[in-house]
């Protein structure tokens, strides 16, 4: 892998630097940002650029405005939050290009920062339109991708734009993402354990197929576990099951067994009579799930067994919660695993995916894991062994 990083560029002074960030952060109904991890994550790259005298243009998307200018998806709240984090004004453009934007760019001084409006206000962004990309580039001399979480998309501000700007580089957030992933998957200190949770097998099918050939321990929790348990012949009541993937689950289990991989499924679970925070619930063996009840969390025997396996690991990757952690009564399994992972002092522990990130933060142990990836889909695609379009163009430019 040969990628040029921003700190390897000899001179940024007075250069017009376009930084693609990912400020696609959650907001409440009043437009207040409720979780700013991705903005915080981009600060080191932005600070480096302005401290070295660059004129910085930032671009991001927010939500899914579907190629239309919708006020609720404005980048203004993100620009305000970034101003607070940087301790300096971040100028806010009302568009992505055009005469007004040109005037703001022309007025930039070394160390200034200009935030463009939401790039997805234009259909050309998601179409990877080269004309739109070059309008965004707007005479910039250096392009920096610091948006790992969107680098699995061949979109104009991530992919096509690299043909419009002469120098192409990656930022520090991107560097961290790729470094930790390579450490975990390319040259891991073994045993290597993967924890996969979440609702459906279908969303992580390719990941599972790939991991069976790479890891030493696989732990399955969340709704997806019950497709595997049914594949093993158990009755799982009203629990979430993808019946069309039963044969696939059997094949994955067989492959894991042939390779000598420790493949752990829940032994017990917390079941409820309905999907609700105030439902009646109880803990039962996975062999005794009532026919009209559904499993919404893993039980204490499962977390104890998972914990024992994880204590043997030197590298851990976790994607997906163990249960419906948004409801307090079904969060114990997820939080228990979070505590175990956080307690692995001598292991490299990597958290990937929005729900897992939220769970680790809610459990209060975010500062005790090695790395929390900002990418959901991008992280999964790397686990699947896929090349990310946004990373591929960086590799090509770095050669």
UniProtKB/Swiss-Prot annotation:
Keyword rRNA-binding: no
Gene3D superfamilies, alphabetized: Phosphoglycerate kinase, N-terminal domain
Catalysed reactions, as listed in the record: (2R)-3-phosphoglycerate + ATP = (2R)-3-phospho-glyceroyl phosphate + ADP
Binding site for substrate: 22-24, 38, 61-64, 120, 153
Protein name per Swiss-Prot or TrEMBL: Phosphoglycerate kinase
Keyword tags: ATP-binding, Cytoplasm, Glycolysis, Kinase, Nucleotide-binding, Transferase
Assembly information from the UniProt record: Monomer.
Principal location: cytoplasm
Residues that bind ATP: 204, 326, 353-356
Phylogenetic classification of the source organism: Bacteria, Pseudomonadati, Thermodesulfobacteriota, Desulfuromonadia, Geobacterales
UniProt-listed CDD domains: Phosphoglycerate_kinase (cd00318)
Gene expressing this chain: pgk
